[in-house]
Design a protein with these regions (language model features):
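A glycine-rich dinucleotide-binding beta-alpha-beta segment and adjacent secondary-structure elements
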Residues: 260-326, 354-367, 485, 496-550, ...
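Core beta-strand elements of the Rossmann-like FAD/NAD(P) dinucleotide-binding domain
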Residues: 93-102
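Conserved N-terminal/central alpha/beta ligand/cofactor-binding core
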Residues: 1-79, 94, 106-123, 130-136, ...
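An anion/pyrophosphate-binding glycine-rich loop and adjacent beta-alpha core
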Residues: 8, 137-274, 362, 371-456, ...
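Extended, charge-enriched "interface" segments that sit outside catalytic cores
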Residues: 384, 401-574, 578-582
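Glycine-rich phosphate/pyrophosphate-binding beta-alpha loops
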Residues: 322-330, 386-388
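Glycine-/small-residue-rich beta->alpha transition segments that form the dinucleotide
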Residues: 102, 107-111, 268-269, 281
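Internal hydrophobic alpha-helix adjacent to the cofactor/substrate pocket in enzyme cavities
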Residues: 15, 332-355
């Protein structure tokens, strides 16, 4: 499987910073690693890894089975037990009853799952795995609204049938980057190649001829699919003028011939999929392991949740992942961690643990879900976050690890690593702010580095702000700075490159970071004005009709959350501020 990607990679780093396992497992099983969006600023950089599927599964299993106090039962849940609006347990298909103080539902695509290949339909949660029945209906009986969504997966190909010489190669990166902040985490597997090629007009012609048998276009599938990961048939219909679409061929592991064709998700009949692919020169002799297919499944309206991911309707019942209308491992993992933390807090007492929009992409994700809801599968992008510069991949540990440590989730070793990094960054930045540079001593070096010589003395930090200058290339010409860097990173030499990169980002982007932090702090004042349960919105005639309807449905916690609800205007917010005595 692929882990990470644009914005998703930041979520995995946040999960790791909070003490989660996804980053560690991904590093351990990565067979290709890349940083995406390198040509843009560091707020947009996102790690992505292709993992060995078999090793990924076993690594996760090993971690789960060796987690203290975690007990595993293999079965299918068919009913929740609810008393007086509070979940108290569940029943499985084997007739086993579990009593519980809290339950976290993470059913993925399995609730009433139905797979489609052409006109063929097959019940299931994914290929060769049965769907889960009865559970949706059990939950809906208590007044929780649900709907249907659709996702898809591409064909799997036998590598022995591919003409790799007719494709472009895409190599991984072997530098210091990884997902986990832990210095014990390493990427030790051999980096494998991926390949790219393109569809053509002949491919599109065959796909178009198959559209009458496509469940997406013949009415067989009514549910909504992901806008930003469309099927190949959706691409050719939506973009009829586009002559080609890029395809990525990705290995499934070190020791398997199975390849994953990213960019060719489809639910067309199998013969159409094969015939179309044979028109791509590299695939002219293609042999497949299985066709692409679409899957429909149930999800629950996430506006029925609190920011803790606890249901507003059934106390102590939490929802996480695709059952909330999201796509992807990363979004699911982030939600699962927050739901799990809050389920524990509900059992043992304490304040709900939530993340704000300026703290984490996970905070943006959950706030979007519970405030705006979903009408299509939700995928995280950097563009969904208004504080991108504050939510960079390099500083997830600085944002979140201390909070996780005080919760008891991040261990002492993780916390100490974060503190060591923080001290090193402060030492480097303070030295750069205070060290004076003289033109006579540095101008020759500046000219060699392709930047303007100094006319008068300045602080080192001013030179570091120039685009041609990096910490490493200027340190070669400033021995005192080189010594300071060695001293600052001596306690964490394994992560020296990571610390230097983070320091350079802090120095070059400090003005933008400060400005974004100031905007976030202004909006935080609205976050402090609690309004949940204060108003009978339906009776406030000075609100617009749409605002009244939306506010009744969402029942926001704060003025700030109310301001993010689609259909609630600034004038509606002013009405609420006046009624709040502000």
């Amino acid at each position: 499987p692929a882990v990470g990607g644009i914005a998703k990679g930041q979520i995995v780093r946040e999960i790791d910073a909070l003490g989660g396992q996804m980053g560690l497992v991904t590093d351990e099983t990565a067979i290709q690693f890349r940083i995406l969006n390198r040509s843009k600023g560091p707020a947009m950089w996102s790690p992505r890894a292709q993992c060995d599927r078999a090793k990924f599964i076993w690594s996760w299993r090993e971690k789960l089975e060796n987690t203290p106090n975690l007990h595993i039962w293999q079965d299918t849940v068919c009913e929740l037990l609810v008393e007086n609006g509070e979940v108290v347990g569940l029943v499985t298909l084997w007739g086993v009853t579990f009593k519980a103080k809290c339950i976290v539902l993470t059913a993925g695509t399995f609730l009433n799952g139905l797979m489609h290949v052409g006109r063929h339909q097959l019940p299931g949660g994914r290929m060769a795995e049965p769907a889960s029945y009865q559970l949706t209906e059990s939950i809906a009986r208590h007044g929780i609204a649900y709907g249907r969504m659709k996702t898809g997966t591409p064909v799997r190909i036998d590598a022995r049938s591919i003409h790799f010489d007719l494709m472009d190669t895409q190599d991984g990166e072997c530098d210091f980057h990884k997902f986990s902040f832990m210095n014990t985490s390493t990427r030790h597997l051999k980096q494998l190649q991926c390949w790219t090629c393109y569809t053509n007009e002949e491919v599109h012609r065959i796909l178009r001829e198959g559209l009458p048998d496509s469940p997406l276009f013949n009415g067989q599938i009514q549910s909504i699919g992901p806008r930003y990961c469309p099927s190949i048939e959706t691409k050719i219909v939506t973009f009829p003028d586009k002559e080609q679409h890029q395809l990525f061929l990705e290995p499934e592991g070190e020791t398997t011939q199975e390849l994953y064709l990213n960019g060719f998700s489809s639910s067309l009949p199998m013969d159409i999929q094969i015939a179309a692919l044979k028109k791509v020169p590299a695939f002219k002799d293609i042999v497949i392991y299985r066709p692409g297919y679409a899957i429909e499944y149930d999800y629950f309206d996430p506006t029925q949740l609190k920011h803790s991911l606890e249901s507003k309707i059934i106390k102590n019942l939490f929802f996480a992942g695709q059952v909330n209308g999201t796509t992807g491992y990363e979004e699911a993992g982030g939600q699962g961690l927050i739901a799990g933390i809050n389920a524990h807090i509900n059992c043992h007492g304490g304040e709900a643990f939530t993340l704000a929009r300026d703290e984490a992409y996970i905070g943006v994700l959950i706030d979007d879900l519970v405030t705006k809801g979903v009408d299509e599968p939700y995928r995280m992008f950097t563009s969904r976050a208004e504080y991108r510069i504050l939510l960079r991949m390099d500083d997830a540990d600085m944002r979140l690890t201390e909070r996780a440590y005080h919760l008891g989730l991040a261990r002492e070793d993780r916390y100490q690593l974060m503190k060591t990094k923080k001290e090193a960054l402060e030492q480097i930045v303070n030295f750069a702010k205070n060290y004076s540079m003289k033109p006579a001593l540095i101008n020759d070096a500046l000219e060699k580095l392709g930047t303007t010589p100094l006319r008068q003395g300045c602080k080192l930090i001013e030179i570091l702000n120039r685009p041609q200058i990096t910490i490493e290339n200027i340190a070669e010409h400033v021995p005192a700075f080189q010594r300071e860097l060695e001293k600052a990173t001596a306690a964490d030499s394994d992560r020296k490159e990571e610390i230097l990169e983070a320091a350079e980002i802090l120095i070059k982007y400090q003005g933008y970071i400060d400005r974004e932090r100031m905007i976030a702090e202004k909006l935080a004042r609205l976050e402090s004005i609690k309004i949940k349960g204060k108003f009978d919105y339906a009776s406030i005639q000075s609100l617009s009709t749409e605002a009244r309807q939306k506010l009744v449905k969402i029942d926001p916690e704060t003025i700030a959350q109310a301001s993010r609800i689609p259909g609630v205007s600034p004038s509606d917010i002013n009405v609420l501020l006046v009624l709040s005595g502000r």
